[in-house]
């Protein structure tokens, strides 16, 4: 289907909460097919791209934290799996020539970053570095409750006003 720009300023695909590696594989396949069909000008990842469960305070509540030598392999595995998931989407974005890409950090990435900041020697595991956002061509938008990503008249954020009560 040829792309028509009649009355369209920009086309975008926006994806929230993929939670790699716990993602729904069929849903990700649909996203990839939608990208091929829509051929968006802009792609926006609304965060929680990774699950990062081992770095959540919820995960460790009531448990003893594992020693660092056990956590590093979990961290490496999670980083690998999340990058693999992002690669699936980026490959399709590359194929259709979508170069405007935004990554809005979600609370799950905040879990990762909070863990990493406690151990300065792990700085290469911060979201921006671990997910290779610069190399992938993403503009990075840290988790920020006061400032949203704004494109035209639309605002994009992770979870700010998107609960079941968002319209009240």
Language-model-detected regions and their locations in the chain:
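Conserved catalytic scaffold of divalent metal-dependent phosphoesterases
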Residues: 77-168
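N-terminal active-site segment of His-dependent metallophosphoesterases
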Residues: 1-87
């Amino acid at each position: 289907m040829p792309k028509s720009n009649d009355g369209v300023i920009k086309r975008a695909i926006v994806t929230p909460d993929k939670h790699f590696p716990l993602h729904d594989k069929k849903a990700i396949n649909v996203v990839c097919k939608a990208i091929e069909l829509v051929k968006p000008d802009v792609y926006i990842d609304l965060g929680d791209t990774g699950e990062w469960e081992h770095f959540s305070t919820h995960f460790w509540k009531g448990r003893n934290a594992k020693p660092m030598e056990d956590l590093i392999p979990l961290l490496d595995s999670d980083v690998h799996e999340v990058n693999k998931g992002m690669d699936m989407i980026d490959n399709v974005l590359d194929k259709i020539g979508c170069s405007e890409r935004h990554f809005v950090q979600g609370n799950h990435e905040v879990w990762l970053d909070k863990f990493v900041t406690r151990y300065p020697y792990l700085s290469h595991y911060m979201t921006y570095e671990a997910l290779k956002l610069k190399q992938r061509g993403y503009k990075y938008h840290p988790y920020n409750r006061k400032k949203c990503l704004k494109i035209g008249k639309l605002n994009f954020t992770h979870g700010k006003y998107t609960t079941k009560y968002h319209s009240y």
